[in-house]
């Protein structure tokens, strides 16, 4: 990668050039973000996953920019306009807008007024006016009157059209205006279409104005969505006269002030250039740039929410009875073994209109006893509270815990190809209930099968740049899977596909080998898997676990490339490697500095020692049960001042949504989080966090609930 890009990335991320250079080199060698951040700390100077991912993002951006530069240079060269100075300007670009501004005058374009004027032979007149090379434009214009130009006025008008287009394509003019526009206010007005119920959700923006520099991402995205739907007209409030004067002043500073007759013509050309060409173009540019920033923030929030969702506490390998609640169609019940395999399914009808409560109680009691059920998972959708109350009437064995589980995305999963492949003989209701039960056992292993956009934890996710969103979500899923580690002998191909260096094809091959040859007994056995070579092994091995392996390091995050270091540590302590692994007292006696070498630095040695103390540790917390307020069943039961327990279901830039046990979630606005001013919700709350809230408003007409966070 060129040094200008290396330096640009380093400046953007506030890191050293060599850190960027080494990261890029590792990427080019096939290394992944999790592998680099975990096992190559010496090469990166200890950059964390976020920083490494940012380097990857920007290296990809600049790789695309380099391709664009080649296209631009070829196009300008073919037009016979490429000079050495122009080539240097293009080569030195590190901003795509700057590159496009430079290319604009040479870009193929549709027929314009300026094109017609040039065809009429008026470009020499425009050149003389533009270069302030004449005093009397009228006298000069007379020379151009003829077959193609009917009058002096037509000649001057054509020359002004050429000048206006030239100004609109001048990079310095565009950048000057861009900086002015960025400091102004974005203003909206309701359109004639904004009369129906669909438009009312944008009512607060029907006559709205806010500084473009300060507008919150969610407000900008809402405004732009309303504009796309035809309910708002959007513009940037700028003073056209001042903008025209500014670019005219800059123009004259570079040349000289024209005499009065020419000045009048130039003012007309500048005014036309601004109003007809520059203002709409620069407005679009600046709003697009503001949206890009809003996209980045929204995608960041989505990624953070997804991380918290994927790393939600698991109950682990327990026998689960899962219920997908319903009224008319009944509650679908499934029983799962410790590995999540389906043992039994049937429907019960404890709620109206059937109301077979006694029979349903007997069924649940029988299933709990027959299958040795340890935990019960209840979906949080329709009839969830009623089903939870019903389960409390069942006399369960001591120790059986009851959990409410988010159903977000379960219906998407149940109708997916993945679900059909897993359960071809069962319908969507059974698949949905199985998904609810498995999410309780291991949220990460189950949720990787579902498109993250279906999980209900985003902010205007359908409005943001989809490629940016996909990149962030893929990185987040990969990060979570690799931070937890994956059991090589139980993981599905969907989970394995997110392990560093594997992907869908190798994941299928790993599962196929396991099916044909039985459980893996060592990490080295991976090298027998079809198409899994040395590079893939290097990237994935440290993130895969083999419980009960002959070598205990195979069930840890210690990479096979470092096994010899652990063996030496054990030998120096006079014990075996098996005796060392997991023995905190022995690990505390290791002198880390003794094992530092040219290839392995102190950061890696410290990581190894920490892993030896708690091999294969799961970074996730333990699952805990939770109960909503029993007296609240609908929004009509709420009143201002009530204090209620709740669970955070979504976090946005403007607040957090909380499930308080009824159909509608409440909103803790950023101003209601117990801190002075507007809080950053993502720094105060976590997804699925259990909270105490006070009701501050209830709007029955719009079914909206306002909440305040209590300490």
Residue ranges and their predicted role:
Residues 51-54, 61, 65-322, 328-414, ...:
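Duplex nucleic acid-engaging cores and interfaces of nucleic-acid transaction enzymes
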């Amino acid at each position: 990668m060129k040094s200008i890009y290396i330096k640009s990335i380093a400046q953007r991320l506030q890191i050293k050039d060599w850190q960027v250079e080494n990261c890029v080199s590792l990427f080019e060698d096939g290394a992944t973000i999790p592998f680099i951040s975990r096992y190559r700390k010496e090469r990166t100077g200890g950059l964390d996953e976020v920083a490494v991912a940012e380097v990857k993002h920007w290296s990809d951006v600049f790789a695309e920019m380099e391709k664009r530069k080649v296209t631009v240079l070829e196009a300008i060269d073919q037009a016979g306009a490429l000079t050495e100075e122009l080539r240097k300007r293009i080569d030195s670009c590190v901003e795509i807008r700057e590159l496009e501004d430079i290319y604009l005058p040479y870009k193929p374009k549709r027929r314009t007024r300026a094109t017609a004027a040039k065809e009429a032979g008026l470009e020499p007149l425009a050149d003389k006016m533009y270069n302030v090379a004449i005093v009397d434009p009228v006298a000069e214009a007379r020379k151009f009157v003829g077959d193609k130009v009917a009058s002096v006025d037509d000649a001057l008008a054509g020359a002004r059209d050429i000048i206006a287009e030239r100004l609109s394509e001048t990079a310095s003019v565009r950048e000057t205006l861009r900086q002015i526009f960025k400091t102004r206010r974005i203003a909206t007005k309701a359109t004639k279409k904004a009369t129906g119920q669909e438009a009312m959700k944008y009512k607060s923006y029907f006559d709205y104005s806010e500084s473009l520099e300060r507008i919150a991402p969610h407000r900008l995205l809402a405004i732009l969505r309303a504009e796309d739907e035809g309910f708002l007209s959007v513009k940037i409030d700028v003073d056209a006269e001042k903008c025209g004067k500014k670019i005219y002043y800059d123009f004259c500073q570079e040349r000289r002030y024209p005499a009065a007759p020419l000045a009048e013509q130039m003012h007309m050309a500048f005014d036309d250039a601004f109003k007809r060409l520059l203002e709409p173009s620069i407005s679009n540019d600046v709003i697009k740039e503001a949206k890009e920033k809003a996209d980045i923030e929204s995608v960041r929030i989505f990624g953070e929410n997804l991380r918290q969702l994927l790393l939600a506490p698991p109950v682990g390998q327990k026998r689960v009875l899962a219920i997908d609640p319903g009224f008319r169609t009944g509650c679908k019940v499934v029983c799962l073994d410790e590995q999540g395999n389906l043992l039994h399914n049937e429907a019960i009808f404890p709620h109206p209109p059937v109301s077979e409560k006694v029979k349903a109680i007997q069924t649940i009691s029988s299933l709990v006893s027959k299958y040795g059920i340890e935990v019960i998972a209840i979906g949080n959708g329709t009839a969830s509270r009623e089903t939870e109350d019903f389960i409390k009437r069942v006399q369960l064995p001591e120790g059986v815990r009851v959990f409410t589980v988010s159903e977000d995305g379960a219906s998407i999963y149940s109708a997916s190809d993945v679900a059909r492949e897993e359960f071809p003989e069962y319908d969507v209701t059974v698949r949905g209930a199985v998904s609810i039960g498995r999410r309780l056992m291991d949220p990460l292993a189950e949720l990787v099968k579902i498109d993250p956009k279906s999980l209900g934890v985003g902010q205007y996710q359908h409005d943001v740049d989809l490629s940016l969103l996909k990149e962030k979500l893929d990185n987040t899923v990969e990060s979570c899977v690799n931070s937890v580690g994956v059991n090589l002998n139980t993981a599905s191909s969907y989970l394995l596909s997110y392990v560093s260096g594997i992907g869908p094809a190798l994941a299928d091959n790993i599962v196929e080998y396991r099916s044909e040859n039985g459980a893996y007994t060592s990490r080295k056995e991976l090298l027998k898997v079809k198409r899994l070579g040395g590079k893939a092994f290097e990237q994935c091995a440290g993130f895969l676990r083999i419980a009960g392996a002959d070598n205990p390091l195979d069930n840890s995050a210690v990479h096979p490339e470092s096994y010899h270091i652990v063996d030496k540590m054990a030998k120096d302590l006079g014990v075996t490697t098996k005796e060392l692994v997991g023995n905190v007292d022995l690990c505390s006696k290791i002198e880390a500095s003794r094992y530092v070498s040219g290839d392995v630095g102190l950061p890696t040695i410290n990581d190894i020692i920490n892993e030896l103390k708690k091999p294969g540790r799961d970074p996730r917390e333990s699952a805990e049960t939770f109960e909503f307020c029993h007296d609240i069943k609908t929004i009509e039961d709420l009143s201002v001042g009530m204090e209620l327990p709740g669970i955070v279901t979504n976090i946005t830039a403007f607040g957090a949504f909380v499930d308080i046990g009824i159909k509608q979630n409440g909103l803790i606005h950023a101003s209601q989080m117990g801190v002075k001013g507007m809080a950053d919700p993502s720094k105060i709350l976590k997804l699925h966090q259990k909270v105490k809230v006070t009701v501050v408003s209830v709007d029955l007409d719009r079914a909206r609930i306002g909440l305040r966070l209590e300490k």
